[in-house]
């Protein structure tokens, strides 16, 4: 494909136009009185949302230079969303302000490399100040207040606080559609996976078609169980104890399945066979998770273990196992607490290191099943469009609340950035900066005013008036845009997670530095649309 190239000011101005078009669309959603944006879809109903990253993903500009500028800001929103789960609009507003302030100086002749160094130093100093002034989340009410602000809905805040109180920070809170109007909250106890019994003959409770095993042995194997000989040997080990048996394997077929069913029907011993969840390496990892949770050892050819020669030491244990047609739940596995904690730490490290959104999601599901549990918030609304919009807000609020638990809280409404910058501006390290590095730092101190001004503007109040007033207030006090009053924001429950605020600034500063130091842009040349065939062509007359 042919390329087009732009240099210096032409390159930067083309990218800036794309950045502005995206940022101006996103920033109208900022704050408690921010507006929604309607996203047209190629199929189905349109989506109405105030989620910055969802809006950014839908914007695809025609001009190639503008598209590149917009893509850079999309990266700010996406990275902030990946790390903190919220703050995408704040990050976009900060990036726009940093780039505009920086380009003024580049046009005036400043060295962009020196400006970038100053931006990085000031941003790092503000992040340190934000972390130092964070307030730990100590109560369920604080979680509820944080989630309420993110979702703009007190009922949602209460449900999320209840969910996280139950499943813990490592637990998973999922959001699903509800058949009825309103919000419902369900909890899953223990480790649950989406595989049920292989045969309905394993059912012990005819009323709800489930198989319930009390204090069972648990046999985990990575291969298929097909041989009658294997089952006979396992049955001999289990029958000595009189306990029921759960078998989780790649599959149970051949002679093995009818042998198990026949023993179950005759009452020789109570057993249930279930297929292992997942595929390939993910299945192996999940079997190992179950082994650690229950104190079992996975019977695998890789380890030189075969079913016809195992002893009872490979069995795991649990207080109860409940198996339905579609899912299996293991309650209170008997594995070592230390082993479970080590496995949890390993999965956390994998989450930190993966670049794949899909892998991250699957790892978080595994983490929740080991460390916490699963809570499901079911959302119902009058229309499909309203339900989708509410689900988006709840998903953001869940991640916001988790971020608050992880790194603590700050005064919200953009106040924390302004007050942290005011402190950092007077610090010895920043005062010692000189020349264009000092100019770069000054760019950051002006840019961090953008979120509070935008929140005020979206509330119908002058941003400059609010900013000047907040500068005069004691630390922690600021503008509550929901009520248009000045008060102690932490006491009023107007808070932002530190993780969200710092991630927004760090990612915005990173992209702004790249933007300012760009000297040329190589873009794909737009293709001319193919000429339409003339009427009557190739008709033979």
From Swiss-Prot:
Keyword Ligase on entry: no
EC number(s) on record?
5.6.1.7
What is the first-listed, main subcellular location in coarse terms?
cytoplasm
Q: Where in the cell is it found?
A: Cytoplasm
Q: Name one GO biological process term.
A: protein refolding
Q: Which GO terms describe its molecular function?
A: ATP binding; ATP-dependent protein folding chaperone; isomerase activity; unfolded protein binding
Which class of enzymes does this protein belong to?
isomerase
Q: What does this protein do?
A: Together with its co-chaperonin GroES, plays an essential role in assisting protein folding. The GroEL-GroES system forms a nano-cage that allows encapsulation of the non-native substrate proteins and provides a physical environment optimized to promote and accelerate protein folding.
Which PANTHER family does the entry link to?
60 KDA HEAT SHOCK PROTEIN, MITOCHONDRIAL
Q: Which family does it belong to?
A: Belongs to the chaperonin (HSP60) family.
Protein name per Swiss-Prot or TrEMBL: Chaperonin GroEL
Organism per entry:
Gardnerella vaginalis
Gene field: groEL
């Amino acid at each position: 494909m042919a390329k087009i190239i732009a240099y210096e000011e032409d390159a930067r101005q083309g990218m800036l136009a794309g950045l502005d078009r995206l940022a101006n669309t996103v920033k109208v959603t900022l704050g408690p009185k921010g507006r929604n944006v309607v996203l047209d879809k190629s199929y189905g109903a349109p989506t109405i949302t105030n989620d910055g990253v969802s809006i950014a993903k839908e914007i695809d500009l025609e001009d190639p230079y503008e598209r590149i500028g917009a893509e850079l800001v999309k990266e700010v929103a996406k990275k902030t969303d990946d790390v903190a789960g919220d703050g995408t609009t704040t990050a976009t507003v900060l990036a726009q302000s940093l780039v505009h302030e920086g380009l003024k100086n580049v046009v005036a002749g400043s060295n962009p490399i020196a400006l970038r160094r100053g931006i990085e130093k000031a941003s790092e100093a503000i992040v340190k100040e934000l972390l130092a002034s964070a307030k730990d989340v100590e109560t369920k009410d604080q979680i509820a207040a944080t989630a309420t602000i993110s979702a703009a809905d007190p009922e949602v805040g209460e449900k999320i606080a209840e969910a996280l109180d139950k499943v813990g920070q490592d637990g998973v809170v999922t959001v699903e559609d509800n058949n009825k109007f309103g919000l419902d909250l369900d909890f899953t106890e223990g480790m649950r996976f989406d595989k049920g019994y292989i045969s309905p003959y394993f059912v012990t409770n005819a009323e709800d078609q489930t198989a319930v095993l009390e204090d069972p042995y648990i046999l985990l194997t990575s291969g298929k169980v097909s041989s009658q000989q294997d089952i006979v040997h396992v049955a001999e080990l289990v029958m000595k104890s009189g306990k029921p048996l759960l078998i989780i394997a790649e599959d149970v077929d051949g002679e093995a399945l009818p042998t198990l069913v026949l023993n179950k029907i005759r009452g020789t011993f109570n057993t249930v066979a279930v297929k292992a969840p997942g595929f390939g390496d993910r299945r192996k990892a999940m079997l190992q998770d179950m082994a650690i949770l229950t104190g079992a050892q996975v019977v695998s050819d890789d380890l030189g273990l075969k079913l016809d020669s195992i002893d009872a030491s490979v069995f795991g244990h649990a207080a109860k196992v409940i198996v339905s047609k579609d899912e299996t739940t293991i309650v209170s596995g008997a594995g070592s607490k230390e082993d479970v904690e080590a496995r949890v730490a390993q999965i956390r490290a994998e989450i930190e290191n993966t670049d794949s959104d899909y892998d991250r999601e699957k790892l978080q599901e595994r983490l929740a099943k080991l460390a916490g549990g699963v809570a499901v918030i079911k959302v119902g609304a009058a229309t499909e469009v309203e339900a989708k919009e509410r689900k988006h807000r709840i998903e953001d609020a869940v991640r916001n609340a988790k971020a608050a638990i992880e790194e603590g809280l700050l005064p919200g409404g953009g106040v924390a950035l302004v007050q942290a910058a005011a402190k950092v501006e007077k610090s010895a390290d920043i005062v010692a900066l000189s020349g264009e590095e000092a100019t770069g730092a000054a760019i950051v101190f002006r840019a961090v005013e953008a979120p509070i001004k935008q929140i005020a503007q979206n509330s119908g109040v002058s941003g400059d008036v609010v900013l000047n007033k907040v500068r005069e207030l004691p630390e922690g006090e600021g503008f509550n845009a929901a009520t248009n009053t000045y008060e102690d924001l932490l006491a009023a429950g107007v808070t932002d997670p530190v993780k969200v605020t710092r991630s927004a600034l760090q990612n915005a500063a990173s992209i702004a530095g790249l933007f300012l130091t760009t000297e040329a842009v190589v873009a794909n040349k737009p293709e001319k649309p193919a000429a339409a065939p003339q009427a009557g062509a190739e008709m033979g007359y």
